[in-house]
């Protein structure tokens, strides 16, 4: 049986769940799938399928990013269930970068917790433009005043990070109740999805720009060749287009895309916002790796030295407790990978304090596909300590 074609008649939007560990992100993801599938007479994606990343089994925490799809009457959604645990902020960064909007899940029994704040901050850094709130586990709280208090706390926290805390939708429900088929909670999931439909605008896709896709994963299909997966950041990729593999190596490699698929369906082309697998001609599994980008030939080049405007997280935001000096060597997280780099401070600046905003020069130990405006995080030992944006390429 051949693969069925992907239906493009509905607008396509990328969303995802964020929030503190055990507040119910994965349960809500499964509940949305269950409630919408029931309404449309389709098969739902089960909790175990979403939670079923291989690493999962040992620790009962979601590590790998799960991608599922579902539809409302108005839209087709691709949903990433972002890992909630602090150890896996790395995945949060790759996950959150894939969202046109996020559903922030906060348990009514706990209220906002440290990772709630961290995920809101990361959403602000990686450019998640809209957040809708789902207050979960409200069936476990009898006190109406307490619910109002938690809602107020969430709204204030969002406002603190420049999201419109007073205006964005907050839906109160029970993900588990909805997943178990209880009508009153199923209704709340429908209400949530109506809010997502209405509040998260249809994204302005970057289809007019030159094609680029950060490589998230690579695997080989026997007899067909090498497939690179990722989310198309901009432009359009058509079957038989020539593309370049850029970054991490000195010279860029040219190849031809011989096939495009999304959600196991074949496409004639992929466009900005699509999560795809691109089949590459004449490329071996070792010629390409996570952290590189696929791009229209000549449109983006690899660089290792640039000026950037950075914000260094304060101690309160989970950043460093002490200043850093010249020759500081953290990791710089670009799109899907960490690269070590050396920081050169501007003349007359001896040190940079947590909470500072400064322009400085960064020299990476390997090249990355970058251009003005490319965003990145600064990390040490897996912990985000800053965020930045490229302002000028030097070499």
Curated annotation (Swiss-Prot):
Residues 10-204 form the tr-type G domain. One of its GO terms (cellular component) is cytosol. The keyword Glycosyltransferase does not apply. It catalyses: GTP + H2O = GDP + phosphate + H(+). Residues 174-176 are annotated as: G5. Residues 136-139 are annotated as: G4. Its main location: cytoplasm. Coiled coil: none annotated. It is found in: Cytoplasm. It comes from the Bacteria. GTP binds at residues 19-26, 81-85, 136-139. Pfam families: GTP_EFTU (PF00009), GTP_EFTU_D2 (PF03144), GTP_EFTU_D3 (PF03143). Residues 81-84 are annotated as: G3. This is Elongation factor Tu. It comes from Exiguobacterium sp. (strain ATCC BAA-1283 / AT1b).
């Amino acid at each position: 049986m051949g693969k069925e074609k992907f239906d493009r008649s509905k607008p396509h939007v990328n969303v995802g769940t964020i929030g503190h560990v055990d507040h119910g992100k994965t349960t809500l993801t499964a509940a949305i799938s269950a409630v919408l599938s029931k309404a449309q007479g389709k098969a739902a994606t089960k909790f175990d399928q979403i939670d079923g990343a291989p690493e999962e089994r040992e620790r009962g925490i979601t590590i790998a990013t799960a991608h599922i799809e579902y539809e409302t009457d108005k839209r087709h959604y691709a949903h990433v269930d972002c890992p909630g645990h602090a150890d896996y902020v790395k995945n949060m960064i790759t996950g959150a970068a894939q969202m046109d909007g996020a559903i922030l899940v906060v348990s009514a029994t706990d209220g906002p917790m440290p990772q709630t704040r961290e995920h809101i901050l990361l959403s602000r850094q990686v450019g998640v433009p809209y957040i809708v709130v789902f207050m979960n586990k409200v069936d476990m709280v009898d006190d109406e005043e307490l619910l109002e208090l938690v809602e107020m706390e969430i709204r204030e926290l969002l406002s603190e990070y420049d999201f419109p805390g007073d205006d964005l939708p907050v839906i109160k429900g029970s993900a588990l109740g909805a997943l178990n088929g209880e009508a009153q909670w199923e209704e709340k999931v429908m209400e949530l999805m109506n809010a997502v439909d209405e509040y998260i605008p249809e994204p302005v896709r970057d289809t007019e720009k030159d094609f680029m896709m950060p490589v998230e994963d690579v695997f080989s299909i026997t007899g067909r060749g090498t497939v690179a997966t990722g989310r198309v950041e901009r432009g359009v990729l058509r079957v038989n287009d020539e593309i370049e593999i850029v970054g991490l190596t000195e010279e860029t490699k040219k190849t031809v895309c011989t096939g495009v698929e999304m959600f196991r369906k074949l496409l004639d082309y992929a466009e900005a916002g699509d999560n795809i697998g691109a089949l590459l001609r004449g490329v071996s599994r070792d010629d390409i790796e996570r952290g590189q980008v696929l791009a229209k030939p000549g449109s983006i080049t690899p660089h290792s030295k640039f000026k950037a405007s950075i914000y260094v997280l304060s101690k309160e935001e989970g950043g460093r407790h002490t200043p850093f000096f010249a020759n500081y060597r953290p990791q710089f997280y670009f799109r899907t990978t960490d690269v070590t780099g050396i920081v050169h401070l501007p003349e007359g600046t001896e040190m940079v304090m947590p909470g500072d905003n400064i322009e400085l020069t960064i020299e990476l130990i390997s090249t990355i596909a970058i251009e003005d405006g490319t965003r990145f995080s600064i990390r040490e030992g897996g912990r985000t300590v800053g965020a930045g944006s490229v302002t000028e390429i030097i070499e």
